[in-house]
């Protein structure tokens, strides 16, 4: 989802046997992301499947990206079959949450 929809490029892709996980390092415009894909991931609990309840869960698991054009971003997501979980306006800005293929919520804010 991150590569296809946000334009990040993978510059390193490793498999770590002790973790039983693949780690992909992505880059775009000087920003880097490190994503893990486990062989046997745990399912997301029901209370983490909606933005409001997920954001109340203690822990580091939230990421947000800024966009200049929410309509164009959403159109690309819809064309690629991305699950749009929630849309709202906050302080005059368009906000959208999408789910990645594993159900993890990712936030986008139009500035």
Where are these regions (language model features)?
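Short, charged, solvent-exposed linker or helix-capping segments at domain edges/interfaces
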Residues: 38, 45-48, 75-76
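Core segments of cupin and vicinal oxygen chelate
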Residues: 1-32, 79
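Short, P/G- and charge-enriched loop/turn segments at secondary-structure junctions
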Residues: 11-12, 48-54
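Active-site/binding-pocket entry motifs
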Residues: 32, 39-42
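Loop/turn position at the start of each blade in beta-propeller repeats
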Residues: 19-21, 58, 91-93
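Eukaryotic phosphotyrosine signaling hubs
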Residues: 60-62
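Vicinal oxygen chelate
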Residues: 14, 24-25, 33, 65, ...
